[in-house]
Amino acid sequence: MYRSLSVLAEESDFIQSELYRNSNYIHPRNKRILYYDCTNYYFEIEEESGLKRYGKSKEHRPNPIVTMGLFMDADGIPMAFDIFPGNQNEQTTLKPLESKILQDFGCSEFIFCSDAGLGSTANRRFNSLVNRAYVITHSLKKMKKEDRDIALNPVQFRKLGYSSFIDLRTLDETDEEVFNTVYYKEIPVVTGSMDETIIVTYSPKYKAYQRKIRARQIERAQKIIASSDRKR
């Protein structure tokens, strides 16, 4: 097996594209939405070698690492991956791998999704070309104040499929349907030369979940404080 790894590495792009093509005969792949993310792997060695470079380890290890970028389809099934030097900025890993998907996988019309760390201006611009679009997570804390104020304003939300506006303060969150509904609002913004739309979502169910998590954290903190006081 180990002796075959060098051969597999050389033919990796071909193997991935053929696996994707043939997997469609077993289960038609949902390529309307593609998810992309990166991770890294560390090596217990003392010096850099090849792709193994000192970089920002997700496990905060002081060892050389390599970075892996992975695309998944809308069903969460892996499509394509590639390995990059551990000291390479993750944002720059997207374009070469996505270009392979465009060229070798026959995918040209999809919505690209990633977290904020991979949503550079260059990556967003690349995914606004031709028949592609993108959805990138965005931190409220990093928004402009005027946009953040609009996002946090409880008015002008909608339900999916409805055009009428909703004031979140009027919701009866004890109602099961209301509790399980996700509400949203759209905020048009201009980022440099790009026209974009910020989509703000509100979920009573997720709010209840986060409230429960915070309550448990507060309870644990209080127990730790009480225990510390007793030891004194």
Regions flagged by a language model, labelled:
Residues 1-232:
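Anion-binding and metal-coordination hotspots
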